[in-house]
């Protein structure tokens, strides 16, 4: 299984993130720890969501797409009044409620506990 990068798949009804076996084993352990959950989400979900938003942008508004994730993401953007956002990275951060800020806060708390 070795060292392979994570790879998202956007072809199905849901977005799937594939990890190597060792990365997935680490993920299963780490996701249970509150202090690590924020940075973990930022590391895995944010880049994949940015890529999904690029796909959504290229394929217009997504409402005619038959993939459930495309329709759900387009509806959520519209519902939050973010449909006109032009930068996928900024939009992804808004959709995930500032994950970098939360990840930094979690990491700071872990560092303070460790000190």
For the regions a protein language model found, what residue spans apply to each?
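Bergerat-fold GHKL/Histidine-kinase-like ATPase
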Residues: 1-115
